[in-house]
């Protein structure tokens, strides 16, 4: 058995043994308040699991394992060894299945821009947290981009220690309440959960949301009593996840953080790109209150290069962090994209958010798809956001066209399921050729596809099937093909190098992580790695902040 499949952990003379990815049973034996743990191969009944556990215990008694030998030598006689023995079986995952917070009714979901998931109560969240096996090698932590201490805060919330759990969440994550809502847990932490196959993963995301929401309700705020302000200050351009995370770490370390953003609210795409039925904006507002209470200063409605020149920041701060994201929409390159009622995904989502927040500058620019037959092109989470927003606006019909099959959709399975429930129709293996219309959209010409060999990214390439063309009627088309970088004009003036695709060059593997070609300037998030998850932007913002602290010191 390789080291990858088998792990030993030495702790106070006690050998703990785990065999990861044995998803059906996990046992503990405690000797003199010390734990010996083991996970077993597939077992489907409690009786079988108990037999395995006691057989394992008996083998330890015979001193035929290194673990038993270590314990016996430390505790002395076997009588003492047995006297202090306590058997603890973790059968919670057998007795209590996965239980997600209840969704609002479909009738309510289709007409309201509020989060669709309800809340756990303390009993429910405790039961779900107790399902965690506390694996010796927690795959959930490794799969999480910020490497949250997931088993540890699950244990705390199971015990009712909400404030302690919130403190632990914030040790690795600057925005846990948002990650609990918008992370695709099904392909990250929960997808890696040992219980995922057969029993249903622990509800990590919903529990993370509960912890932070409940802690805020209880009055939790970061303890800044230990902090001493330094004479250093850093300018952060962009109040999205990367910028916020950078400011959080810097401020906790006594480095003053001034955050500039062109929008009137913080959050970046958290606020303007993610609809309220996934993330209510009061959640972002609460985080802003927390950050300002910590000492972070925001300068909003200020576009760098237009309202404020970058030179001013460069000369007046000890370092600068760029976290401006990627806001330029990718185009399909086919005829008809410029027709009226063809919209870019982000323009559509921002229009909707501005109306809901009552901050739109020009009411005539509001995009209202009520009563229209809407087609959304794309298969990612942004496409799902557009689909579900159109439903809530009262569109007559909403169809989502994707050029691969459902299995190869890049979006979260949870979001696809929610869209289907709300009435969105999906057409797979269909590729757009041309948007049809004269003075406005009348339909879209498409061709059916089949999947060929995998490309360099491991995804199978869609191949058009000759003679399979058809036209689908539509009144409006939303293009959700993703985003690309849009380097600012002033990058060259300050020696900020980019790749050919416009992404800023700021490698993680160097002395100062995420430092650009200009030593004083750091960058992270989507403008470095391309459009990605909120949680990866948080990770890079935090890591860049650590490098900045070292740099300015």
Regions found by a protein language model. Give the residues of each.
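Feature captures the FAD/FMN-dependent oxidoreductase FAD-binding
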Residues: 164, 228, 233-237, 285-334, ...
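Beta1-alpha1 glycine-rich phosphate/pyrophosphate-binding loop at the start
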Residues: 86-87, 91-118, 147-159, 169-170, ...
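FAD-site-proximal beta/loop scaffold in flavoenzymes
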Residues: 88, 338-371, 454-531
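Ferredoxin-type iron-sulfur electron-transfer modules in oxidoreductases and energy-metabolism complexes
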Residues: 109-129, 149-181, 198-227, 352-353
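Glycine-rich dinucleotide-binding loop and its adjacent helix/turn
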Residues: 207, 211-228, 286-306, 329-393, ...
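A conserved FAD-binding loop/helix module that cradles the flavin
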Residues: 386, 527-552
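Basic/aromatic DNA-contact patch characteristic of tyrosine site-specific recombinases
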Residues: 1-75, 80
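Short cysteine clusters
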Residues: 132-135, 140, 144, 179, ...
């Amino acid at each position: 058995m390789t080291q990858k499949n088998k792990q030993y952990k030495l702790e106070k003379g006690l050998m703990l043994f785990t065999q990861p990815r044995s998803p059906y049973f996990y046992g503990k034996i405690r000797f003199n308040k010390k734990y010996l743990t083991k996970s077993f191969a597939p077992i489907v009944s409690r009786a079988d699991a108990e037999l395995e556990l006691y057989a394992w215990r008996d083998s330890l008694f015979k001193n035929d394992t290194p673990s038993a030998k270590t314990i016996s030598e430390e505790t002395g006689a076997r009588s003492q060894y047995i006297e202090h023995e306590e058997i603890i079986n973790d059968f919670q995952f057998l007795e209590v299945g996965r239980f997600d917070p209840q969704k609002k009714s479909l009738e309510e979901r289709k007409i309201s821009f509020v989060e669709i998931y309800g809340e756990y109560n303390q009993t429910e969240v405790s039961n779900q947290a107790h399902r965690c096996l506390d694996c010796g090698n927690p795959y959930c932590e490794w799969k999480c981009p910020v490497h949250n201490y997931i088993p540890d805060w699950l244990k705390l919330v199971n015990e009712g220690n909400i404030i302690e759990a919130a403190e632990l969440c914030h040790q690795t994550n600057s925005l846990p309440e948002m990650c609990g809502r918008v992370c695709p847990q099904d392909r990250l932490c929960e997808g890696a959960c040992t219980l995922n196959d057969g029993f249903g993963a622990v509800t990590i995301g919903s529990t993370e949301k509960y912890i932070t929401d409940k802690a805020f309700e209880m009055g939790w705020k970061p303890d800044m009593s230990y902090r001493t302000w330094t004479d250093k200050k850093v300018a952060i351009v962009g109040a999205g996840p990367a910028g916020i995370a950078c400011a959080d770490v810097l401020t906790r370390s006594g480095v003053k953080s001034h955050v500039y953003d062109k929008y009137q609210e913080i959050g970046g795409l958290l606020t303007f790109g993610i609809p309220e039925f996934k993330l209510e904006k009061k959640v972002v507002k609460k985080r802003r209150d927390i950050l300002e209470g910590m000492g972070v200063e925001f300068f909003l409605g200020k576009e760098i290069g237009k309202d404020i020149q970058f030179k001013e920041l460069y000369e007046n701060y000890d370092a600068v962090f760029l976290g401006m994201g990627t806001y330029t929409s990718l185009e399909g390159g086919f005829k008809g994209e410029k027709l009226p009622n063809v919209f870019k995904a982000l323009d559509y989502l921002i229009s909707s958010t501005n109306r809901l927040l009552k901050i739109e500058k020009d009411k005539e620019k509001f995009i209202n798809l009520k009563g229209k037959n809407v087609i959304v092109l794309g298969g990612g989470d942004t496409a799902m956001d557009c689909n579900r927003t159109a439903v809530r606006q009262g569109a007559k019909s909403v169809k989502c066209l994707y050029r691969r099959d459902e299995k190869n959709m890049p979006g979260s399975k949870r979001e696809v399921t929610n869209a289907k429930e709300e009435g969105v129709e999906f057409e797979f293996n269909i590729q757009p050729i041309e948007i049809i219309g004269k003075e406005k959209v009348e339909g879209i010409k498409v061709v059916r596809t089949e999947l060929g060999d995998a490309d360099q990214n491991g995804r199978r390439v869609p191949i058009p099937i000759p003679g399979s063309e058809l036209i689908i009627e539509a009144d409006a088309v939303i293009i959700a093909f993703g985003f690309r970088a849009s380097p600012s004009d002033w990058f060259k003036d300050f020696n900020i190098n980019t790749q050919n695709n416009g992404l800023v060059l700021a490698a993680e593997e160097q002395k100062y992580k995420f430092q650009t070609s200009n030593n004083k300037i750091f960058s992270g998030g989507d403008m470095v790695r391309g459009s990605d998850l909120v949680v990866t932007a948080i990770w890079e913002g935090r890591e860049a902040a650590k490098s900045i602290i070292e740099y300015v010191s």
